[in-house]
UniProtKB/Swiss-Prot annotation:
It comes from Influenza A virus (strain A/Tokyo/3/1967 H2N2). GO terms for molecular function: endonuclease activity; metal ion binding; RNA binding. The gene is PA. A motif (Nuclear localization signal 2 (NLS2)) lies at residues 184-247. Keywords: Cap snatching, Endonuclease, Eukaryotic host gene expression shutoff by virus, Eukaryotic host transcription shutoff by virus, Host cytoplasm, Host gene expression shutoff by virus, Host nucleus, Host-virus interaction, Hydrolase, Inhibition of host RNA polymerase II by virus, Manganese, Metal-binding, Nuclease, Phosphoprotein. It is found in: Host cytoplasm; Host nucleus. One of its GO terms (cellular component) is host cell cytoplasm. Influenza RNA polymerase is composed of three subunits: PB1, PB2 and PA. Interacts (via C-terminus) with PB1 (via N-terminus). Belongs to the influenza viruses PA family. GO terms for biological process: cap snatching; DNA-templated transcription; symbiont-mediated suppression of host gene expression; symbiont-mediated suppression of host mRNA transcription via inhibition of RNA polymerase II activity; viral RNA genome replication; viral translational frameshifting. This is Polymerase acidic protein. The keyword Transmembrane does not apply. Phosphorylated on serines and threonines by host kinases, including human casein kinase II. A motif (Nuclear localization signal 1 (NLS1)) lies at residues 124-139.
Length: 716
């Protein structure tokens, strides 16, 4: 192929193609088909421009080279074939002098008569397929597209072919000649198929023996041997109807392709039922902290020491009592468990030296709360093979739950700023190479936007709790260890602060497999009255344990302090992921970075500084019933972070399923918005798969509600 290209094309074109391939790091000795394609495209661009001039009256005329009028103004400016820097300089110059809109991608030509950029395409496939690909990539009404094929077909924007018929015929004849020359040398099939990315390597050797038998056995239905299947594939027309392709694959498939129009999609049906309940492993917006600033006490940094110091800052303790019972639990046991924690903490304080860890007495209330001796006895399967009615436990279907407003409030709160810094710069990692200067700048800007965010507090809280629980589960397997729920931050003045949210008591934890469960009881402080949204706290028993004096603009006021108690469980694998919640920072930073990259590629310079410092510009954050919500770049950073954090906090099979299935519908809707005229079959089945995941999970239900808002506004 390389020899053919050098013989068939003008040396200047060959040299330009070599430069282009070198610029993109491609080896023309290996990518010979690409080499031929670039030469062909260059030649078509030059032929398109040749002999076309504009006279003094501004009319387009065709003039042969030996004509004395060849000093007339060229009608077309050739952009293709120049190196990228020079090409963009030419484009910018044209835009400045003509007022044309700057294209996002480098076009091939500029037409001074029609005042428009032109994108030339040369395809070995169907012209309309290639045209759609070009149009979808460019997404600009200002760039004119003209596609030629090797079979003499052509397609142009609005059927406006720009050139006279004779000029176009010259191009088509040249393409047909190239095709014939390639075919004569046995190069055409490889060249034709390479545009579709087809592998042709199997044509070079014969499959025999065992591999041949395996090939014959693994054919799709209705094909008796490999030759038949090969013949079918070779003659396969890519522009055939999808229905036809499907029916050829299997007699069982009978799919009717339906056009997907603006009126086609319906909203996702959310389940009815009682409101959904809070299921996170720790309280989020309702959490209350007992804090100490600039901790310098003996044993500072040892969780139990820190916890006792924080507990001493509160003086409003009172005799606890139940204000919202757990419907199914033995509520007095929860009350007794809290009293036991207070008593055992008091015992520690009375000791001469405070221990580093505290194992609780195995009282009846804790045994009940932690499910001690409740698990059924495990019997080896071999010992019960002969039991005729051996069967798995009957399990009830989960009860359907409806979306409740509290989860949207939780998300909104997670996006807000607090008055403390929750991460230091080194949480994301230091530079390791000079090239990371821009990365450092982006990281610093991003950190500044999210370090005060409540979602970042949830990350650090989650990392601490999961690390402490996993350590205790491994180090004290048989003990009911008391684990303080602690976080650390800095005040806006830069002072260190240690916070206590409550306590966890861990149950027995002989965790052999990743999915083996350790039970724990969580006891968390809060100022939220559970009677305001009792459905949210279905899984909790809530006690009133004290009164807190709060300073406000009108003076001091007393508020009841509550303790939210519940039995919960987790596993090694869940704790492992919980310990790695800092990944959420990285994920949201990468999403922001892709936005900066998109902006930078359009402007052709790094836009990091402008992106973060232009406070007047707003960005789309998400959909709501009101429409598309906009906000500052900081709000975008915090929203993306909160989404990532909630995906971690509320991780579940329902979320996995909903994300995977709803994405398919999203892609079809996106194709419709891009005017790609998508078609679908079994759309009902897709809706079924999506709605199957909407059971009772609050975060999934909220995402489904957001998806419906998106559908409403995307298809207006």
């Amino acid at each position: 192929m390389e020899d053919f290209v050098r013989q068939c094309f003008n040396p200047m074109i060959v040299e330009l193609a070599e430069k282009a391939m070198k610029e993109y790091g491609e080896d023309l000795k290996i990518e010979t088909n690409k080499f031929a394609a670039i030469c062909t495209h260059l030649e078509v661009c030059f032929m398109y421009s040749d002999f076309h001039f504009i006279n003094e009256q501004g009319e387009s005329i065709v003039v042969e080279l030996d004509d004395p009028n060849a000093l007339l103004k060229h009608r077309f400016e050739i952009i293709e074939g120049r190196d990228r820097t020079m090409a963009w300089t030419v484009v910018n110059s044209i835009c400045n002098t003509t007022g044309a809109e700057k294209p996002k991608f480098l076009p091939d030509l500029y037409d001074y008569k029609e005042n428009r950029f032109i994108e030339i395409g040369v395809t070995r496939r169907e012209v309309h397929i290639y045209y759609l690909e070009k149009a979808n990539k460019i997404k600009s009404e200002n760039t004119h597209i003209h596609i030629f094929s090797f079979t003499g077909e052509e397609m142009a924007t609005k059927a406006d072919y720009t050139l006279d018929e004779e000029s176009r015929a010259r191009i088509k004849t040249r393409l047909f000649t190239i095709r014939q020359e390639m075919a004569n040398r046995g190069l055409w099939d490889s060249f034709r198929q390479s545009e579709r990315g087809e592998e042709t390597i199997e044509e070079r050797f014969e499959i025999t023996g065992t591999m041949r038998r395996l090939a014959d056995q693994s054919l799709p239905p209705n094909f008796s041997c490999l030759e038949n299947f090969r013949a079918y594939v070779d003659g396969f027309e890519p522009n055939g109807y999808i229905e036809g392709k499907l029916s050829q694959m299997s007699k069982e498939v009978n799919a009717k392709i339906e056009p997907f129009l603006k009126t086609t999609p319906r909203p996702i049906r959310l389940p009815d039922g009682p409101p959904c309940f809070q299921r996170s492993k720790f309280l989020l917006m309702d959490a209350l902290k007992l804090s100490i600033e600039d901790p310098s006490h003996e044993g500072e940094g040892i969780p139990l020491y820190d916890a006792i110091k924080c507990m001493r800052t509160f003086f409003g303790w009172k005799e606890p009592y139940i204000v919202k019972p757990h419907e199914k639990g033995i509520n007095p046991n929860y009350l007794l468990s809290w009293k036991q924690v207070l008593a055992e903490l008091q015992d520690i304080e009375n000791e001469e030296k405070i221990p580093r860890t505290k194992n609780m007495k195995k009282t009846s209330q804790l045994k009940w709360a932690l499910g001690e001796n409740m698990a059924p006895e495990k019997v080896d399967f071999d010992n019960c093979r002969d039991i005729s009615d051996l069967k798995q436990y009957d399990s009830d279907e989960p009860e359907l739950r409806s979306l409740s407003s509290w989860i949207q409030n939780e998300f909104n709160k997670a996006c807000e700023l607090t008055d403390s810094t929750w991460i230091e710069l080194d949480e994301i990692g230091e530079d390791v190479a000079p090239i990371e200067y821009i990365a450092s700048m982006r990281r610093n800007y991003f950190t500044a936007e999210v370090s005060h965010c409540r979602a970042t507090e949830y990350i650090m809280k989650g990392v601490y709790i999961n690390t402490a629980l996993l350590n205790a589960s491994c180090a004290a397997m048989d003990d009911f260890q008391l684990i303080p729920m602690i976080s650390k931050c800095r005040t806006k003045e830069g002072r260190r602060k240690t916070n206590l949210y409550g306590f966890i008591i861990k149950g027995r934890s002989h965790l052999r497999n990743d999915t083996d469960v350790v039970n724990f009881v969580s006891m968390e402080f809060s100022l939220t009255d559970p009677r305001l949204e009792p459905h949210k706290w279905e899984k909790y028993c809530v006690l009133e344990i004290g009164d807190m004096l709060l300073r406000s603009a009108i003076g001091q006021m007393s508020r009841p302090m509550f303790l939210y108690v519940r039995t919960n469980g987790t596993s090694k694998i869940k704790m492992k992921w919980g310990m790695e919640m800092r990944r959420c920072l990285l994920q949201s930073l990468q999403q922001i970075e892709s936005m900066i990259e998109a902006e930078s590629s359009v402007k052709e310079k790094d836009m990091t500084k402008e992106f973060f410092e232009n406070k007047s510009e707003t960005w789309p954050i998400g959909e709501s019933p009101k429409g598309v919500e906009d906000g500052s770049i900081g709000k975008v950073c915090r929203t993306l972070l909160a989404k990532s954090v909630f995906n971690s906090l509320y991780a579940s099979p329902q979320l996995e399923g909903f994300s995977a299935e709803s994405r398919k519908l999203l892609l079809v809707v996106q194709a419709l918005r891009d005017n790609l005229e998508p078609g679908t079959f079994d759309l009902g089945g897709l809706y079924e798969a999506i709605e199957e995941c909407l059971i009772n999970d609050p975060w999934v239900l909220l995402n489904a509600s957001w998806f419906n808002s998106f559908l409403t506004h995307a298809l207006r």
